[in-house]
Amino acid sequence: MAFKLKSLVVAGALLGSLVLAGCGQNEKDPKSIKVGVIVGAEQQVAEVAKKVAKDKYGLNVELVTFNDYVMPNEALSRGDIDLNAFQHKPYLDQQIKDRNYKLTPAGNTFVYPIAGYSKKIKSLDELQDGAQVALPNDPTNLGRSLLLLQKQGLIKLKEGTGLLPTVLDVVENPKGLKLIELEAPQLPRSLDDNKIDLAVINTTYASQINLTPAKDGLFVEDKDSPYVNIIVSREDNKDSEAVKQFVQAYQSDEVFNEADKVFNGGAVKGW
């Protein structure tokens, strides 16, 4: 009986050690963090933030790239990544409302102005009646684009629509423009479509075909835009030291200089 009891004690101790070891392996390294970014120009900027985070804080950053605006928040919500850096607050607010995400801003990055681009006309004076205008179809960037068209005098929106007007809120359209909603990643390619005369494109996607607002835009969003981009965390990790350090790294002169270069002066500090 004594031998049997001793064996059980030893076995229990070994099992406990294995459980503890397993728990230790599952614990997150406090000096490592996964950050979701959009492939392309924003990824280039984030690479500099990654280096600054390592050099200044000893933080190991793994960048996880995405090709659209939907999956980075989904991955963050699931816990596949720890942060993302690609969106402005109106977009995040809409995503939280639509999908009940427990996400929150952790810090500001840059304002990336949207602009109107065309391969068919050189100025808005050349825009013909009935022209087709491509716009992003997600609610916040659609609203942002419609407000920009209104500012150019191309349409008039119903009063009181705030930052989220839709095409149904257009009350005046003197040129009879046909407003075509597309997925944001499709907008750069739409410029080669014979049917599309003008496209309003976010700087992130415009930069993928080497377009910049200041040089190539027929009209550009003001730099005092409310659409400042943000770094986003979950509510359960927003106060972690790693999150704070990555935000500080992103808000460095080194990262601003890279963004200014990559976007040809199209990036404006949001902090």
Q: Which residues fall in each region the model found?
A:
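C-terminal motif of bacterial Sec signal peptides marking the signal peptidase cleavage site
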Residues: 19-22
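Bacterial signal peptide processing site
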Residues: 24-26
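Short, polar/charged alpha-helical segment
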Residues: 32, 39-65, 71, 75-77
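Beta->alpha turn/N-cap motifs
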Residues: 40, 67-69, 79, 83-93, ...
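Short helix-initiation/N-cap motifs at beta->coil->alpha
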Residues: 63-74, 161-189
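A conserved helix-loop-strand patch within extracytoplasmic ligand-binding domains
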Residues: 106-155, 256
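Periplasmic-binding protein-like
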Residues: 107-118, 143-150, 207-271
